[in-house]
Design a protein with these regions (language model features):
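Helix-biased detector of long, well-ordered alpha-helical tracts
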Residues: 2-346
Protein backbone atom coordinates (compact mmCIF):
# COMPACT_ATOMS: atom_id res chain seq x y z
CA UNK A 1 0.00 0.00 0.00
CA UNK A 2 1.19 3.53 -0.82
CA UNK A 3 1.26 5.32 2.54
CA UNK A 4 0.45 8.95 3.21
CA UNK A 5 3.84 9.66 4.82
CA UNK A 6 5.78 8.63 1.68
CA UNK A 7 3.54 10.01 -1.02
CA UNK A 8 4.67 12.30 -3.84
CA UNK A 9 1.51 12.59 -5.86
CA UNK A 10 3.10 14.28 -8.87
CA UNK A 11 5.34 11.24 -9.42
CA UNK A 12 2.23 9.14 -10.10
CA UNK A 13 1.17 10.94 -13.29
CA UNK A 14 3.09 11.55 -16.55
CA UNK A 15 1.31 14.90 -16.95
CA UNK A 16 0.29 17.12 -14.06
CA UNK A 17 -2.86 19.20 -13.72
CA UNK A 18 -4.18 20.96 -16.81
CA UNK A 19 -1.07 19.91 -18.75
CA UNK A 20 -2.82 16.52 -18.99
CA UNK A 21 -5.60 17.98 -21.13
CA UNK A 22 -6.25 16.65 -24.61
CA UNK A 23 -4.82 19.22 -27.03
CA UNK A 24 -7.24 21.89 -28.30
CA UNK A 25 -6.78 20.89 -31.93
CA UNK A 26 -7.55 17.22 -31.26
CA UNK A 27 -10.51 18.16 -29.08
CA UNK A 28 -11.97 20.46 -31.73
CA UNK A 29 -11.79 17.65 -34.27
CA UNK A 30 -13.68 15.25 -32.00
CA UNK A 31 -16.36 17.74 -30.95
CA UNK A 32 -16.96 18.76 -34.55
CA UNK A 33 -18.53 15.37 -35.25
CA UNK A 34 -21.05 15.49 -32.42
CA UNK A 35 -24.72 16.45 -32.90
CA UNK A 36 -25.77 20.04 -32.28
CA UNK A 37 -28.42 20.77 -29.66
CA UNK A 38 -30.89 23.56 -30.36
CA UNK A 39 -32.67 25.13 -27.40
CA UNK A 40 -33.43 28.86 -27.19
CA UNK A 41 -32.62 28.82 -23.48
CA UNK A 42 -29.15 27.29 -24.00
CA UNK A 43 -27.32 30.61 -24.13
CA UNK A 44 -23.81 29.11 -24.27
CA UNK A 45 -23.08 25.58 -25.48
CA UNK A 46 -20.17 23.99 -27.32
CA UNK A 47 -20.06 26.28 -30.36
CA UNK A 48 -17.50 28.79 -29.06
CA UNK A 49 -15.33 26.60 -26.78
CA UNK A 50 -16.40 28.72 -23.83
CA UNK A 51 -15.57 28.01 -20.19
CA UNK A 52 -18.98 26.69 -19.16
CA UNK A 53 -22.54 26.14 -20.33
CA UNK A 54 -25.17 28.78 -19.56
CA UNK A 55 -28.86 27.82 -19.46
CA UNK A 56 -31.63 30.38 -18.90
CA UNK A 57 -34.18 29.41 -16.27
CA UNK A 58 -36.05 32.72 -16.17
CA UNK A 59 -35.64 36.32 -17.28
CA UNK A 60 -33.52 36.98 -14.19
CA UNK A 61 -31.70 33.69 -13.62
CA UNK A 62 -29.44 31.42 -15.63
CA UNK A 63 -27.48 28.36 -14.52
CA UNK A 64 -23.77 28.06 -15.21
CA UNK A 65 -22.66 24.43 -15.44
CA UNK A 66 -19.07 23.23 -15.65
CA UNK A 67 -16.79 20.42 -14.57
CA UNK A 68 -13.06 20.03 -14.34
CA UNK A 69 -10.77 17.34 -12.95
CA UNK A 70 -7.15 16.34 -13.42
CA UNK A 71 -4.14 14.40 -12.21
CA UNK A 72 -2.08 15.64 -9.23
CA UNK A 73 -0.36 18.98 -9.63
CA UNK A 74 1.00 19.06 -6.07
CA UNK A 75 2.67 16.41 -3.93
CA UNK A 76 0.65 17.25 -0.83
CA UNK A 77 -2.89 15.76 -1.01
CA UNK A 78 -4.53 18.74 0.70
CA UNK A 79 -2.84 21.19 -1.67
CA UNK A 80 -3.93 19.06 -4.63
CA UNK A 81 -7.54 19.17 -3.44
CA UNK A 82 -7.48 22.93 -3.02
CA UNK A 83 -5.93 23.56 -6.43
CA UNK A 84 -8.29 21.21 -8.26
CA UNK A 85 -11.29 22.85 -6.61
CA UNK A 86 -10.08 26.39 -7.33
CA UNK A 87 -9.53 25.39 -10.95
CA UNK A 88 -13.04 23.95 -11.31
CA UNK A 89 -14.70 26.93 -9.62
CA UNK A 90 -12.81 29.29 -11.92
CA UNK A 91 -15.03 28.57 -14.93
CA UNK A 92 -18.01 30.08 -13.10
CA UNK A 93 -16.03 33.22 -12.28
CA UNK A 94 -14.90 33.44 -15.91
CA UNK A 95 -18.56 33.78 -16.92
CA UNK A 96 -19.22 36.49 -14.32
CA UNK A 97 -21.23 34.14 -12.11
CA UNK A 98 -21.42 32.98 -8.50
CA UNK A 99 -20.74 29.32 -7.60
CA UNK A 100 -23.60 27.70 -5.68
CA UNK A 101 -23.18 23.90 -5.57
CA UNK A 102 -20.39 21.44 -6.28
CA UNK A 103 -20.02 17.67 -6.63
CA UNK A 104 -16.77 15.74 -6.18
CA UNK A 105 -15.28 13.75 -9.08
CA UNK A 106 -12.71 11.20 -7.82
CA UNK A 107 -10.53 8.46 -9.29
CA UNK A 108 -8.35 6.72 -6.70
CA UNK A 109 -6.00 3.70 -6.66
CA UNK A 110 -7.15 0.76 -4.54
CA UNK A 111 -3.62 0.23 -3.13
CA UNK A 112 -3.23 3.79 -1.84
CA UNK A 113 -3.77 4.85 1.78
CA UNK A 114 -7.36 6.08 2.05
CA UNK A 115 -6.17 8.91 4.32
CA UNK A 116 -4.67 10.48 1.20
CA UNK A 117 -8.13 10.58 -0.36
CA UNK A 118 -9.49 12.13 2.81
CA UNK A 119 -6.94 14.94 2.60
CA UNK A 120 -7.68 15.57 -1.09
CA UNK A 121 -11.40 15.83 -0.34
CA UNK A 122 -10.78 18.04 2.68
CA UNK A 123 -8.75 20.44 0.54
CA UNK A 124 -11.52 20.58 -2.04
CA UNK A 125 -14.22 21.07 0.58
CA UNK A 126 -12.34 23.93 2.22
CA UNK A 127 -11.94 25.70 -1.13
CA UNK A 128 -15.64 25.26 -1.98
CA UNK A 129 -16.51 26.69 1.42
CA UNK A 130 -14.16 29.64 0.82
CA UNK A 131 -16.05 30.29 -2.43
CA UNK A 132 -19.34 30.44 -0.53
CA UNK A 133 -20.75 27.39 -2.32
CA UNK A 134 -21.92 24.06 -0.89
CA UNK A 135 -20.50 20.60 -1.54
CA UNK A 136 -23.47 18.30 -2.15
CA UNK A 137 -22.00 14.88 -2.99
CA UNK A 138 -19.94 13.24 -5.69
CA UNK A 139 -18.83 10.05 -7.42
CA UNK A 140 -15.74 7.83 -7.12
CA UNK A 141 -14.11 5.12 -9.22
CA UNK A 142 -10.95 3.02 -8.82
CA UNK A 143 -8.10 3.97 -11.14
CA UNK A 144 -4.33 3.51 -11.27
CA UNK A 145 -3.72 7.28 -11.23
CA UNK A 146 -5.44 9.57 -8.73
CA UNK A 147 -7.63 12.26 -10.23
CA UNK A 148 -9.81 14.87 -8.58
CA UNK A 149 -12.07 17.73 -9.51
CA UNK A 150 -15.56 19.16 -9.26
CA UNK A 151 -18.76 19.57 -11.18
CA UNK A 152 -19.95 23.08 -10.33
CA UNK A 153 -23.25 24.90 -10.79
CA UNK A 154 -23.43 28.67 -10.50
CA UNK A 155 -25.96 31.46 -10.89
CA UNK A 156 -25.77 34.46 -13.21
CA UNK A 157 -28.10 37.08 -14.67
CA UNK A 158 -28.78 35.87 -18.26
CA UNK A 159 -28.51 39.46 -19.46
CA UNK A 160 -25.12 40.13 -17.89
CA UNK A 161 -22.91 37.04 -18.16
CA UNK A 162 -19.53 37.14 -19.92
CA UNK A 163 -18.56 35.14 -22.98
CA UNK A 164 -15.18 34.33 -24.49
CA UNK A 165 -16.13 36.31 -27.59
CA UNK A 166 -17.20 39.89 -28.22
CA UNK A 167 -13.77 41.51 -27.84
CA UNK A 168 -13.71 44.84 -29.68
CA UNK A 169 -10.98 46.67 -31.55
CA UNK A 170 -9.15 48.93 -29.11
CA UNK A 171 -9.87 46.79 -26.05
CA UNK A 172 -7.04 46.18 -23.62
CA UNK A 173 -6.34 42.70 -22.30
CA UNK A 174 -5.91 42.23 -18.56
CA UNK A 175 -4.53 39.01 -17.03
CA UNK A 176 -5.08 38.56 -13.29
CA UNK A 177 -2.48 35.90 -12.34
CA UNK A 178 1.18 35.35 -13.11
CA UNK A 179 2.11 32.84 -15.81
CA UNK A 180 4.49 29.89 -15.69
CA UNK A 181 2.67 27.25 -13.64
CA UNK A 182 3.23 24.52 -16.23
CA UNK A 183 6.93 25.27 -16.52
CA UNK A 184 7.33 25.44 -12.74
CA UNK A 185 5.45 22.18 -12.19
CA UNK A 186 7.76 20.50 -14.70
CA UNK A 187 10.74 21.84 -12.74
CA UNK A 188 9.18 20.72 -9.45
CA UNK A 189 8.88 17.15 -10.77
CA UNK A 190 12.60 17.33 -11.60
CA UNK A 191 13.37 18.50 -8.02
CA UNK A 192 14.97 21.74 -9.28
CA UNK A 193 12.80 24.33 -7.53
CA UNK A 194 13.60 26.28 -4.36
CA UNK A 195 11.11 26.15 -1.52
CA UNK A 196 10.23 29.81 -2.02
CA UNK A 197 9.45 29.34 -5.72
CA UNK A 198 7.47 26.19 -4.99
CA UNK A 199 5.33 28.02 -2.44
CA UNK A 200 4.74 30.87 -4.89
CA UNK A 201 3.34 28.62 -7.61
CA UNK A 202 1.19 26.68 -5.13
CA UNK A 203 -0.24 29.90 -3.69
CA UNK A 204 -1.08 31.15 -7.18
CA UNK A 205 -2.84 27.92 -8.17
CA UNK A 206 -4.82 27.80 -4.91
CA UNK A 207 -6.03 31.39 -5.30
CA UNK A 208 -9.69 31.72 -6.26
CA UNK A 209 -10.56 33.99 -9.18
CA UNK A 210 -13.42 35.39 -7.10
CA UNK A 211 -11.73 38.71 -6.27
CA UNK A 212 -10.84 39.34 -9.92
CA UNK A 213 -14.41 38.50 -10.94
CA UNK A 214 -15.86 40.93 -8.40
CA UNK A 215 -13.63 43.73 -9.68
CA UNK A 216 -14.56 43.12 -13.32
CA UNK A 217 -18.28 43.09 -12.45
CA UNK A 218 -18.04 46.81 -11.70
CA UNK A 219 -16.99 47.56 -15.28
CA UNK A 220 -17.87 46.81 -18.88
CA UNK A 221 -16.36 43.49 -19.96
CA UNK A 222 -16.51 42.69 -23.67
CA UNK A 223 -15.04 39.17 -23.39
CA UNK A 224 -13.58 37.01 -20.63
CA UNK A 225 -12.08 33.57 -20.14
CA UNK A 226 -9.78 31.87 -17.67
CA UNK A 227 -6.30 30.80 -18.69
CA UNK A 228 -5.86 27.10 -18.03
CA UNK A 229 -4.64 24.08 -19.99
CA UNK A 230 -4.56 25.70 -23.43
CA UNK A 231 -2.24 28.43 -22.15
CA UNK A 232 -2.55 32.16 -22.65
CA UNK A 233 -1.88 31.70 -26.37
CA UNK A 234 -4.52 29.02 -26.84
CA UNK A 235 -7.25 30.82 -24.91
CA UNK A 236 -6.38 34.17 -26.52
CA UNK A 237 -6.62 32.49 -29.93
CA UNK A 238 -10.08 31.15 -29.08
CA UNK A 239 -11.14 34.66 -28.04
CA UNK A 240 -9.69 36.20 -31.20
CA UNK A 241 -11.28 33.70 -33.58
CA UNK A 242 -14.68 33.88 -31.89
CA UNK A 243 -14.53 37.71 -31.90
CA UNK A 244 -13.21 37.93 -35.50
CA UNK A 245 -10.27 40.00 -34.28
CA UNK A 246 -6.52 39.66 -33.76
CA UNK A 247 -5.08 39.61 -30.26
CA UNK A 248 -1.67 41.22 -29.66
CA UNK A 249 0.30 40.07 -26.60
CA UNK A 250 3.17 42.15 -25.21
CA UNK A 251 5.43 39.60 -23.50
CA UNK A 252 7.35 42.31 -21.66
CA UNK A 253 4.13 43.08 -19.73
CA UNK A 254 3.30 39.51 -18.69
CA UNK A 255 3.21 38.84 -14.93
CA UNK A 256 5.55 35.89 -14.36
CA UNK A 257 6.09 33.50 -11.44
CA UNK A 258 9.55 33.44 -9.79
CA UNK A 259 12.34 31.54 -11.61
CA UNK A 260 10.24 30.83 -14.72
CA UNK A 261 12.76 32.46 -17.08
CA UNK A 262 15.56 30.24 -15.76
CA UNK A 263 13.66 26.99 -16.21
CA UNK A 264 12.09 27.96 -19.54
CA UNK A 265 15.54 28.84 -20.87
CA UNK A 266 16.71 25.37 -19.77
CA UNK A 267 14.01 23.82 -21.95
CA UNK A 268 11.74 22.61 -19.14
CA UNK A 269 8.63 23.12 -21.25
CA UNK A 270 5.64 20.78 -20.78
CA UNK A 271 4.45 18.91 -23.86
CA UNK A 272 1.10 20.66 -23.71
CA UNK A 273 2.80 23.93 -24.67
CA UNK A 274 3.71 22.52 -28.08
CA UNK A 275 0.17 21.25 -28.65
CA UNK A 276 -1.15 24.69 -27.72
CA UNK A 277 1.23 26.33 -30.18
CA UNK A 278 0.15 23.96 -32.98
CA UNK A 279 -3.49 24.84 -32.31
CA UNK A 280 -2.83 28.59 -32.49
CA UNK A 281 -0.75 28.24 -35.65
CA UNK A 282 -3.76 26.82 -37.52
CA UNK A 283 -5.31 30.30 -37.55
CA UNK A 284 -2.00 32.15 -37.72
CA UNK A 285 0.67 33.29 -35.27
CA UNK A 286 3.17 36.08 -35.78
CA UNK A 287 5.92 36.26 -33.17
CA UNK A 288 8.99 38.43 -32.69
CA UNK A 289 9.41 37.56 -29.00
CA UNK A 290 12.33 35.78 -27.33
CA UNK A 291 11.90 32.01 -27.45
CA UNK A 292 11.41 31.56 -23.70
CA UNK A 293 8.73 34.26 -23.65
CA UNK A 294 7.01 32.65 -26.61
CA UNK A 295 7.07 29.31 -24.79
CA UNK A 296 5.59 31.05 -21.75
CA UNK A 297 2.64 32.30 -23.83
CA UNK A 298 1.73 28.69 -24.70
CA UNK A 299 2.58 27.19 -21.28
CA UNK A 300 -0.45 25.23 -19.98
CA UNK A 301 -1.67 26.79 -16.76
CA UNK A 302 -3.46 25.11 -13.88
CA UNK A 303 -5.96 27.33 -12.09
CA UNK A 304 -4.70 30.36 -14.00
CA UNK A 305 -6.07 33.88 -13.92
CA UNK A 306 -8.88 35.59 -15.79
CA UNK A 307 -8.18 37.13 -19.19
CA UNK A 308 -10.56 40.01 -19.88
CA UNK A 309 -11.01 42.35 -22.84
CA UNK A 310 -12.11 45.73 -21.50
CA UNK A 311 -12.42 49.30 -22.81
CA UNK A 312 -9.17 51.25 -22.54
CA UNK A 313 -10.86 54.03 -20.54
CA UNK A 314 -11.52 51.66 -17.61
CA UNK A 315 -8.04 50.15 -17.38
CA UNK A 316 -6.50 52.52 -14.78
CA UNK A 317 -9.34 52.03 -12.29
CA UNK A 318 -9.55 48.29 -12.90
CA UNK A 319 -5.82 47.87 -12.29
CA UNK A 320 -6.04 50.01 -9.16
CA UNK A 321 -8.73 47.72 -7.74
CA UNK A 322 -7.00 44.50 -8.77
CA UNK A 323 -3.84 45.73 -7.06
CA UNK A 324 -5.82 46.60 -3.93
CA UNK A 325 -7.18 43.03 -3.95
CA UNK A 326 -3.60 41.73 -3.84
CA UNK A 327 -3.62 40.28 -7.35
CA UNK A 328 -0.53 40.07 -9.57
CA UNK A 329 -2.32 41.42 -12.63
CA UNK A 330 -1.00 43.02 -15.81
CA UNK A 331 -2.21 44.82 -18.91
CA UNK A 332 -0.72 42.31 -21.31
CA UNK A 333 -2.00 43.24 -24.73
CA UNK A 334 -4.73 44.62 -26.93
CA UNK A 335 -7.36 43.70 -29.49
CA UNK A 336 -6.95 44.97 -33.06
CA UNK A 337 -8.78 44.54 -36.36
CA UNK A 338 -8.42 41.08 -37.89
CA UNK A 339 -5.10 40.56 -39.67
CA UNK A 340 -3.72 37.62 -41.62
CA UNK A 341 -2.98 36.01 -38.25
CA UNK A 342 -5.14 35.83 -35.13
CA UNK A 343 -2.35 35.95 -32.52
CA UNK A 344 0.58 38.35 -32.49
CA UNK A 345 3.33 37.93 -29.89
CA UNK A 346 5.76 40.76 -29.29
Amino acid sequence: MIMKEKIQLTKLAPNCGCAAKVGPGTLAGVLGGLPKFCDPDLLVGTDTSDDAAVYRVSDDLALIQTLDFFTPVADDPYDFGQIAAANALSDVYAMGGTPKTALNIVAFPKDMDVEILGEILRGGADKVMEAGAVLAGGHTIQDDTPKYGLSVTGFVDPRKFWKNFGAQTGDKLILTKALGAGIMNTAIKADLVTEGARKAVLASMKKLNRDACEVFKEFEVHACTDVTGFGLGGHATEMAVASDRTVVIDTEKLPVLPDVEEFASMGLIPGGAYRNREFAEKTGVKSVAELWREDLVFDPQTSGGLLAAVPERDVPEIMKRLDAAGLQAGVIGEVVDRREWTLEIR
